[in-house]
Amino acid sequence: HTYPNPCMRILDSAMVNVLGEYGGIGRPVEGHTWDIGRKWGYIQYDTEKKVTDTYCMYARDLIDIKQNDWCAAAVYTQTTDVEGEVNGFYTYDREVLKVDAKRVREANEAVINAPLEAPVQIVRPSAFHYKDPSAGVRNQLNLYALRNGDLTMQVTDFGARVISLFAPDRNGNIDDIIVGYGEGEKYVHNAGERFLGATVGRVANRIGGGRFTLDGVTYNLPKNNNGQTLHGGLLGIDMVVWKLKERTDSSITLSYTAPDGQDGFPGNLSIDLTYILTSDNGLDIAYKATTDKATPVNLSNHAFYNLHGSKGGTILDHVITINADKVTPVDKVLIPTGEHLAVEGTPFDFRQPHAIGERIGENHPQLAFCGGYDLNWELNVPSDGNLHSVCTVSDPTTGRKMEILTDQPGLQFYSGNFFDGSYCGKVEGQPIGYREALALE
Protein backbone atom coordinates (compact mmCIF):
# COMPACT_ATOMS: atom_id res chain seq x y z
CA HIS A 1 0.00 0.00 0.00
CA THR A 2 1.01 3.64 -0.20
CA TYR A 3 0.79 6.33 2.42
CA PRO A 4 -1.90 9.00 1.85
CA ASN A 5 0.60 11.76 1.18
CA PRO A 6 -0.14 14.07 -1.76
CA CYS A 7 3.55 14.98 -2.01
CA MET A 8 4.72 11.38 -2.22
CA ARG A 9 7.04 10.68 -5.09
CA ILE A 10 5.84 8.41 -7.88
CA LEU A 11 7.22 4.94 -7.35
CA ASP A 12 8.76 2.87 -10.10
CA SER A 13 5.88 0.86 -11.57
CA ALA A 14 8.14 -2.18 -11.73
CA MET A 15 8.72 -2.15 -7.98
CA VAL A 16 6.55 -3.94 -5.47
CA ASN A 17 4.94 -1.23 -3.37
CA VAL A 18 4.59 -3.08 -0.06
CA LEU A 19 5.63 -2.30 3.49
CA GLY A 20 6.78 -4.90 5.99
CA GLU A 21 3.75 -4.74 8.22
CA TYR A 22 1.49 -5.44 5.27
CA GLY A 23 2.89 -8.88 4.49
CA GLY A 24 -0.46 -10.55 4.04
CA ILE A 25 -1.64 -10.06 7.61
CA GLY A 26 -2.67 -6.79 9.18
CA ARG A 27 -3.27 -6.11 12.84
CA PRO A 28 -6.20 -3.71 13.20
CA VAL A 29 -5.22 -0.82 15.44
CA GLU A 30 -7.80 1.76 16.40
CA GLY A 31 -6.58 5.10 15.05
CA HIS A 32 -4.34 3.40 12.50
CA THR A 33 -6.56 2.67 9.54
CA TRP A 34 -6.72 3.23 5.82
CA ASP A 35 -10.44 3.94 5.74
CA ILE A 36 -11.14 7.27 4.06
CA GLY A 37 -12.42 9.89 6.45
CA ARG A 38 -11.08 8.22 9.58
CA LYS A 39 -8.09 9.32 11.60
CA TRP A 40 -4.81 7.74 10.61
CA GLY A 41 -1.63 7.77 12.59
CA TYR A 42 0.09 6.62 15.72
CA ILE A 43 -2.01 5.84 18.77
CA GLN A 44 -1.44 8.36 21.53
CA TYR A 45 -0.99 7.21 25.15
CA ASP A 46 -0.79 9.30 28.29
CA THR A 47 1.72 7.17 30.22
CA GLU A 48 4.93 5.41 29.34
CA LYS A 49 3.64 2.17 30.86
CA LYS A 50 0.67 2.07 28.46
CA VAL A 51 3.03 2.56 25.53
CA THR A 52 5.33 -0.23 26.69
CA ASP A 53 2.50 -2.65 27.51
CA THR A 54 0.86 -2.11 24.13
CA TYR A 55 4.18 -2.46 22.33
CA CYS A 56 4.80 -5.78 24.08
CA MET A 57 1.29 -6.99 23.22
CA TYR A 58 1.78 -6.39 19.51
CA ALA A 59 5.33 -7.71 19.59
CA ARG A 60 3.99 -10.98 20.99
CA ASP A 61 1.55 -11.10 18.10
CA LEU A 62 4.52 -11.05 15.76
CA ILE A 63 5.68 -14.34 17.22
CA ASP A 64 2.54 -15.89 15.77
CA ILE A 65 2.93 -14.11 12.44
CA LYS A 66 6.57 -15.02 11.89
CA GLN A 67 5.71 -18.73 11.93
CA ASN A 68 3.97 -18.28 8.59
CA ASP A 69 5.87 -18.58 5.36
CA TRP A 70 6.28 -15.38 3.35
CA CYS A 71 5.11 -13.14 6.18
CA ALA A 72 6.92 -10.14 7.55
CA ALA A 73 5.82 -7.99 10.46
CA ALA A 74 6.76 -4.83 12.32
CA VAL A 75 5.65 -2.70 15.23
CA TYR A 76 6.28 0.99 14.63
CA THR A 77 7.29 3.30 17.44
CA GLN A 78 7.74 7.02 17.00
CA THR A 79 11.10 7.76 18.59
CA THR A 80 11.56 11.35 17.44
CA ASP A 81 9.50 14.45 16.77
CA VAL A 82 10.01 14.12 13.03
CA GLU A 83 10.03 10.81 11.23
CA GLY A 84 10.96 10.48 7.59
CA GLU A 85 10.36 7.40 5.50
CA VAL A 86 11.56 6.34 2.08
CA ASN A 87 8.31 7.22 0.36
CA GLY A 88 8.41 10.81 1.52
CA PHE A 89 5.78 10.71 4.27
CA TYR A 90 6.54 12.60 7.48
CA THR A 91 4.91 12.76 10.89
CA TYR A 92 5.36 15.59 13.36
CA ASP A 93 3.62 15.65 16.69
CA ARG A 94 5.28 16.88 19.87
CA GLU A 95 2.35 15.67 21.99
CA VAL A 96 2.98 12.01 21.23
CA LEU A 97 5.01 10.21 23.89
CA LYS A 98 8.28 9.17 22.31
CA VAL A 99 9.78 5.75 22.96
CA ASP A 100 13.50 5.83 23.64
CA ALA A 101 15.73 3.12 22.19
CA LYS A 102 16.63 1.70 25.61
CA ARG A 103 13.00 0.96 26.46
CA VAL A 104 12.42 -0.61 23.05
CA ARG A 105 15.40 -2.93 23.56
CA GLU A 106 14.21 -3.89 27.04
CA ALA A 107 10.70 -4.61 25.77
CA ASN A 108 12.03 -6.71 22.90
CA GLU A 109 14.22 -8.73 25.26
CA ALA A 110 11.26 -9.33 27.58
CA VAL A 111 9.17 -10.66 24.71
CA ILE A 112 11.89 -12.73 23.04
CA ASN A 113 13.14 -14.28 26.27
CA ALA A 114 9.67 -15.09 27.60
CA PRO A 115 8.81 -18.81 27.71
CA LEU A 116 6.57 -20.09 24.95
CA GLU A 117 3.06 -19.72 26.31
CA ALA A 118 1.33 -22.14 23.97
CA PRO A 119 2.27 -25.19 21.89
CA VAL A 120 3.38 -24.80 18.30
CA GLN A 121 0.04 -26.13 17.05
CA ILE A 122 -1.57 -22.78 17.92
CA VAL A 123 -3.83 -21.77 15.02
CA ARG A 124 -1.98 -19.47 12.64
CA PRO A 125 -3.44 -16.12 11.59
CA SER A 126 -2.66 -16.85 7.93
CA ALA A 127 -5.20 -19.69 8.05
CA PHE A 128 -8.02 -17.31 8.89
CA HIS A 129 -9.37 -16.19 5.56
CA TYR A 130 -12.21 -17.22 3.29
CA LYS A 131 -13.07 -16.99 -0.37
CA ASP A 132 -16.07 -15.04 -1.58
CA PRO A 133 -17.40 -17.15 -4.49
CA SER A 134 -19.41 -14.25 -5.95
CA ALA A 135 -16.45 -11.87 -6.07
CA GLY A 136 -13.70 -14.44 -6.48
CA VAL A 137 -11.54 -12.77 -3.83
CA ARG A 138 -9.96 -13.87 -0.57
CA ASN A 139 -11.02 -12.01 2.56
CA GLN A 140 -8.90 -11.99 5.69
CA LEU A 141 -10.40 -12.56 9.13
CA ASN A 142 -8.67 -11.40 12.28
CA LEU A 143 -7.35 -13.79 14.90
CA TYR A 144 -6.40 -12.35 18.29
CA ALA A 145 -4.30 -13.96 21.02
CA LEU A 146 -4.97 -13.29 24.72
CA ARG A 147 -2.66 -14.40 27.51
CA ASN A 148 -2.74 -14.44 31.30
CA GLY A 149 -1.50 -16.88 33.92
CA ASP A 150 -1.29 -20.37 32.44
CA LEU A 151 -3.91 -19.67 29.77
CA THR A 152 -3.57 -18.64 26.13
CA MET A 153 -6.70 -18.01 24.11
CA GLN A 154 -7.45 -17.24 20.46
CA VAL A 155 -10.53 -15.32 19.33
CA THR A 156 -11.67 -14.38 15.84
CA ASP A 157 -13.89 -11.49 14.81
CA PHE A 158 -16.05 -13.82 12.72
CA GLY A 159 -18.93 -14.57 15.06
CA ALA A 160 -16.82 -13.39 18.04
CA ARG A 161 -15.70 -17.01 18.33
CA VAL A 162 -13.40 -18.76 20.75
CA ILE A 163 -11.00 -20.67 18.50
CA SER A 164 -8.51 -22.07 21.02
CA LEU A 165 -7.95 -22.16 24.76
CA PHE A 166 -4.65 -23.63 25.92
CA ALA A 167 -4.59 -24.90 29.50
CA PRO A 168 -2.17 -27.07 31.52
CA ASP A 169 -2.91 -30.56 32.82
CA ARG A 170 -1.84 -31.82 36.25
CA ASN A 171 1.74 -32.25 34.98
CA GLY A 172 1.95 -28.80 33.43
CA ASN A 173 1.50 -30.03 29.85
CA ILE A 174 -0.33 -27.34 27.87
CA ASP A 175 -2.91 -28.28 25.27
CA ASP A 176 -5.93 -26.87 23.46
CA ILE A 177 -9.26 -27.78 25.11
CA ILE A 178 -11.51 -26.09 22.51
CA VAL A 179 -12.97 -28.23 19.72
CA GLY A 180 -13.14 -26.37 16.43
CA TYR A 181 -11.56 -25.77 13.05
CA GLY A 182 -8.09 -24.55 12.17
CA GLU A 183 -9.15 -22.57 9.10
CA GLY A 184 -11.46 -19.60 8.74
CA GLU A 185 -12.93 -21.03 5.56
CA LYS A 186 -14.59 -23.87 7.47
CA TYR A 187 -16.31 -21.49 9.89
CA VAL A 188 -17.58 -19.16 7.16
CA HIS A 189 -18.84 -21.85 4.82
CA ASN A 190 -20.09 -24.13 7.61
CA ALA A 191 -18.06 -27.29 7.15
CA GLY A 192 -20.23 -29.13 9.66
CA GLU A 193 -21.26 -27.79 13.07
CA ARG A 194 -22.06 -24.13 12.44
CA PHE A 195 -21.88 -22.85 16.02
CA LEU A 196 -18.43 -24.07 17.07
CA GLY A 197 -17.04 -21.49 19.52
CA ALA A 198 -19.53 -18.82 18.44
CA THR A 199 -21.39 -16.08 20.23
CA VAL A 200 -25.03 -16.91 19.49
CA GLY A 201 -28.22 -14.83 19.46
CA ARG A 202 -30.30 -12.72 19.30
CA VAL A 203 -32.00 -15.64 20.97
CA ALA A 204 -29.88 -18.65 21.85
CA ASN A 205 -31.60 -22.04 21.67
CA ARG A 206 -34.88 -22.63 19.83
CA ILE A 207 -37.98 -20.56 19.10
CA GLY A 208 -40.89 -22.90 18.41
CA GLY A 209 -42.39 -22.70 14.94
CA GLY A 210 -40.11 -19.81 14.04
CA ARG A 211 -42.42 -17.13 15.38
CA PHE A 212 -43.19 -15.13 18.50
CA THR A 213 -45.61 -12.40 19.58
CA LEU A 214 -44.43 -9.22 21.29
CA ASP A 215 -46.65 -6.26 22.23
CA GLY A 216 -49.45 -7.69 20.11
CA VAL A 217 -47.32 -8.09 16.98
CA THR A 218 -46.42 -11.54 15.61
CA TYR A 219 -42.94 -11.85 14.11
CA ASN A 220 -42.11 -14.64 11.67
CA LEU A 221 -38.51 -15.82 11.63
CA PRO A 222 -36.51 -18.03 9.26
CA LYS A 223 -36.72 -21.70 10.24
CA ASN A 224 -33.24 -23.16 10.21
CA ASN A 225 -33.66 -26.26 12.39
CA ASN A 226 -36.42 -28.82 11.84
CA GLY A 227 -39.12 -26.16 11.48
CA GLN A 228 -37.79 -24.08 14.39
CA THR A 229 -35.50 -21.04 14.67
CA LEU A 230 -32.19 -22.03 16.27
CA HIS A 231 -29.63 -19.62 17.75
CA GLY A 232 -30.95 -16.52 15.99
CA GLY A 233 -31.82 -17.79 12.52
CA LEU A 234 -30.03 -17.94 9.19
CA LEU A 235 -27.53 -15.17 9.91
CA GLY A 236 -27.73 -14.68 13.66
CA ILE A 237 -24.77 -12.93 15.23
CA ASP A 238 -22.41 -15.84 14.57
CA MET A 239 -22.21 -15.54 10.77
CA VAL A 240 -21.11 -11.90 10.73
CA VAL A 241 -17.82 -10.08 11.28
CA TRP A 242 -17.65 -8.16 14.55
CA LYS A 243 -15.71 -4.93 15.08
CA LEU A 244 -12.74 -4.67 17.41
CA LYS A 245 -13.60 -2.12 20.08
CA GLU A 246 -10.86 -2.53 22.68
CA ARG A 247 -8.01 -4.88 23.35
CA THR A 248 -5.30 -5.56 25.93
CA ASP A 249 -2.88 -8.44 26.34
CA SER A 250 -5.46 -10.39 28.36
CA SER A 251 -8.83 -9.05 27.18
CA ILE A 252 -10.77 -8.09 24.09
CA THR A 253 -14.08 -6.35 23.42
CA LEU A 254 -15.86 -6.93 20.12
CA SER A 255 -19.04 -5.19 19.00
CA TYR A 256 -21.79 -5.82 16.49
CA THR A 257 -25.07 -4.09 15.68
CA ALA A 258 -27.80 -6.33 14.33
CA PRO A 259 -30.05 -4.09 12.19
CA ASP A 260 -33.80 -3.82 12.60
CA GLY A 261 -35.41 -6.71 10.75
CA GLN A 262 -32.36 -8.95 10.59
CA ASP A 263 -33.61 -12.56 10.74
CA GLY A 264 -37.08 -11.10 11.34
CA PHE A 265 -36.35 -9.56 14.76
CA PRO A 266 -37.42 -5.99 15.60
CA GLY A 267 -35.05 -3.22 16.63
CA ASN A 268 -31.43 -2.27 16.10
CA LEU A 269 -29.56 -4.37 18.66
CA SER A 270 -26.06 -3.19 19.62
CA ILE A 271 -23.94 -5.79 21.40
CA ASP A 272 -20.60 -5.54 23.17
CA LEU A 273 -18.91 -8.82 24.03
CA THR A 274 -15.85 -8.94 26.29
CA TYR A 275 -13.53 -11.89 26.89
CA ILE A 276 -11.09 -11.56 29.80
CA LEU A 277 -8.42 -14.02 30.88
CA THR A 278 -7.86 -13.58 34.61
CA SER A 279 -4.68 -14.14 36.60
CA ASP A 280 -6.25 -17.11 38.42
CA ASN A 281 -6.73 -19.05 35.15
CA GLY A 282 -10.28 -17.90 34.58
CA LEU A 283 -12.16 -16.86 31.46
CA ASP A 284 -14.76 -14.13 31.99
CA ILE A 285 -17.41 -13.59 29.31
CA ALA A 286 -19.50 -10.42 29.63
CA TYR A 287 -22.36 -9.24 27.39
CA LYS A 288 -23.91 -5.81 27.04
CA ALA A 289 -26.82 -5.16 24.70
CA THR A 290 -28.95 -2.11 23.93
CA THR A 291 -31.89 -1.76 21.56
CA ASP A 292 -34.14 0.98 20.21
CA LYS A 293 -37.24 -1.30 20.14
CA ALA A 294 -38.62 -4.01 22.37
CA THR A 295 -36.98 -7.26 21.23
CA PRO A 296 -36.10 -10.62 22.77
CA VAL A 297 -32.43 -10.95 23.71
CA ASN A 298 -30.82 -14.13 25.01
CA LEU A 299 -27.08 -14.27 24.26
CA SER A 300 -24.75 -17.17 24.91
CA ASN A 301 -21.37 -18.64 24.07
CA HIS A 302 -21.24 -21.93 22.17
CA ALA A 303 -17.69 -23.11 22.76
CA PHE A 304 -17.22 -26.88 22.63
CA TYR A 305 -14.80 -28.39 25.16
CA ASN A 306 -12.77 -31.56 25.43
CA LEU A 307 -10.54 -31.57 28.51
CA HIS A 308 -8.40 -34.37 27.06
CA GLY A 309 -6.86 -31.75 24.77
CA SER A 310 -6.21 -31.63 21.04
CA LYS A 311 -5.97 -35.42 20.66
CA GLY A 312 -9.68 -35.59 21.36
CA GLY A 313 -11.49 -38.74 22.32
CA THR A 314 -14.83 -39.27 24.01
CA ILE A 315 -16.11 -36.88 26.66
CA LEU A 316 -18.18 -39.63 28.25
CA ASP A 317 -15.45 -40.11 30.88
CA HIS A 318 -15.63 -36.44 31.91
CA VAL A 319 -17.18 -36.02 35.35
CA ILE A 320 -19.81 -33.29 35.71
CA THR A 321 -21.82 -31.65 38.46
CA ILE A 322 -24.76 -29.28 37.93
CA ASN A 323 -26.44 -27.49 40.82
CA ALA A 324 -30.05 -27.89 39.69
CA ASP A 325 -33.11 -29.66 41.10
CA LYS A 326 -35.08 -29.49 37.84
CA VAL A 327 -34.67 -29.54 34.08
CA THR A 328 -36.91 -28.10 31.37
CA PRO A 329 -38.33 -31.05 29.37
CA VAL A 330 -38.84 -30.76 25.61
CA ASP A 331 -41.03 -32.31 22.93
CA LYS A 332 -39.87 -34.31 19.91
CA VAL A 333 -38.66 -31.17 18.10
CA LEU A 334 -36.81 -29.99 21.24
CA ILE A 335 -39.19 -27.17 22.17
CA PRO A 336 -39.91 -26.78 25.93
CA THR A 337 -43.25 -28.21 26.98
CA GLY A 338 -43.74 -25.69 29.80
CA GLU A 339 -43.27 -28.36 32.45
CA HIS A 340 -40.54 -28.66 35.07
CA LEU A 341 -39.04 -32.11 35.56
CA ALA A 342 -37.49 -32.95 38.93
CA VAL A 343 -34.06 -34.55 38.45
CA GLU A 344 -34.40 -36.80 41.50
CA GLY A 345 -34.17 -40.43 40.37
CA THR A 346 -33.43 -39.55 36.73
CA PRO A 347 -30.28 -39.56 34.55
CA PHE A 348 -30.36 -35.75 34.79
CA ASP A 349 -29.42 -35.60 38.47
CA PHE A 350 -25.89 -34.20 38.57
CA ARG A 351 -26.13 -32.66 42.00
CA GLN A 352 -23.45 -35.20 42.90
CA PRO A 353 -20.57 -35.97 40.49
CA HIS A 354 -21.26 -38.47 37.72
CA ALA A 355 -19.40 -39.42 34.57
CA ILE A 356 -21.29 -38.17 31.52
CA GLY A 357 -21.42 -41.67 30.06
CA GLU A 358 -22.62 -43.32 33.25
CA ARG A 359 -26.37 -42.93 32.57
CA ILE A 360 -26.55 -41.40 29.08
CA GLY A 361 -27.75 -44.69 27.58
CA GLU A 362 -30.68 -45.17 29.96
CA ASN A 363 -34.21 -45.57 28.66
CA HIS A 364 -35.68 -42.12 29.25
CA PRO A 365 -37.89 -40.22 26.76
CA GLN A 366 -35.92 -36.99 27.18
CA LEU A 367 -32.66 -38.78 26.34
CA ALA A 368 -34.39 -40.32 23.33
CA PHE A 369 -35.72 -36.97 22.07
CA CYS A 370 -32.30 -35.31 22.39
CA GLY A 371 -30.08 -38.23 21.42
CA GLY A 372 -28.31 -37.80 24.75
CA TYR A 373 -27.98 -34.78 27.00
CA ASP A 374 -29.29 -31.54 25.48
CA LEU A 375 -31.57 -29.85 28.03
CA ASN A 376 -31.79 -26.73 30.13
CA TRP A 377 -30.98 -27.23 33.81
CA GLU A 378 -32.93 -24.87 36.09
CA LEU A 379 -30.15 -23.66 38.36
CA ASN A 380 -30.38 -23.36 42.13
CA VAL A 381 -29.14 -19.78 42.25
CA PRO A 382 -30.67 -16.59 43.68
CA SER A 383 -31.70 -13.81 41.30
CA ASP A 384 -29.37 -11.27 42.87
CA GLY A 385 -27.24 -10.35 39.86
CA ASN A 386 -24.12 -11.97 41.32
CA LEU A 387 -22.04 -14.81 39.93
CA HIS A 388 -22.65 -18.22 41.51
CA SER A 389 -20.89 -21.54 40.97
CA VAL A 390 -23.32 -23.84 39.14
CA CYS A 391 -21.32 -26.51 37.32
CA THR A 392 -17.98 -28.32 37.28
CA VAL A 393 -16.46 -30.55 34.61
CA SER A 394 -13.30 -32.57 35.21
CA ASP A 395 -11.20 -35.07 33.30
CA PRO A 396 -9.73 -37.77 35.56
CA THR A 397 -7.09 -38.62 32.94
CA THR A 398 -5.45 -35.19 32.61
CA GLY A 399 -6.57 -33.60 35.86
CA ARG A 400 -8.03 -30.61 34.03
CA LYS A 401 -11.10 -29.12 35.68
CA MET A 402 -13.36 -26.21 34.83
CA GLU A 403 -15.92 -24.48 37.01
CA ILE A 404 -18.84 -22.51 35.57
CA LEU A 405 -20.13 -19.41 37.36
CA THR A 406 -23.10 -17.40 36.12
CA ASP A 407 -25.73 -14.87 37.12
CA GLN A 408 -28.30 -16.51 34.82
CA PRO A 409 -31.12 -18.94 35.80
CA GLY A 410 -30.42 -21.73 33.30
CA LEU A 411 -27.59 -23.83 31.84
CA GLN A 412 -27.90 -25.85 28.64
CA PHE A 413 -25.67 -28.94 28.74
CA TYR A 414 -25.13 -30.58 25.34
CA SER A 415 -23.13 -33.79 25.03
CA GLY A 416 -22.14 -33.54 21.35
CA ASN A 417 -24.75 -36.03 20.17
CA PHE A 418 -24.74 -34.98 16.51
CA PHE A 419 -21.01 -35.06 15.78
CA ASP A 420 -20.53 -37.98 13.40
CA GLY A 421 -16.88 -37.84 12.32
CA SER A 422 -17.72 -36.51 8.86
CA TYR A 423 -15.42 -33.48 9.16
CA CYS A 424 -12.04 -32.77 10.73
CA GLY A 425 -11.15 -30.31 13.46
CA LYS A 426 -7.91 -28.42 14.01
CA VAL A 427 -5.70 -31.51 13.84
CA GLU A 428 -5.26 -32.58 10.22
CA GLY A 429 -6.81 -35.95 9.49
CA GLN A 430 -8.52 -36.14 12.89
CA PRO A 431 -12.32 -36.01 12.62
CA ILE A 432 -14.60 -34.70 15.36
CA GLY A 433 -16.32 -37.88 16.45
CA TYR A 434 -19.55 -38.78 18.18
CA ARG A 435 -19.68 -37.24 21.67
CA GLU A 436 -16.12 -35.93 21.50
CA ALA A 437 -17.12 -32.42 22.59
CA LEU A 438 -19.49 -30.87 25.10
CA ALA A 439 -21.10 -27.44 25.28
CA LEU A 440 -22.28 -25.52 28.35
CA GLU A 441 -24.50 -22.64 27.20
Over which residues does each language-model region extend?
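Short secondary-structure junctions and interdomain/linker hinges
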Residues: 62-69, 111-115, 207
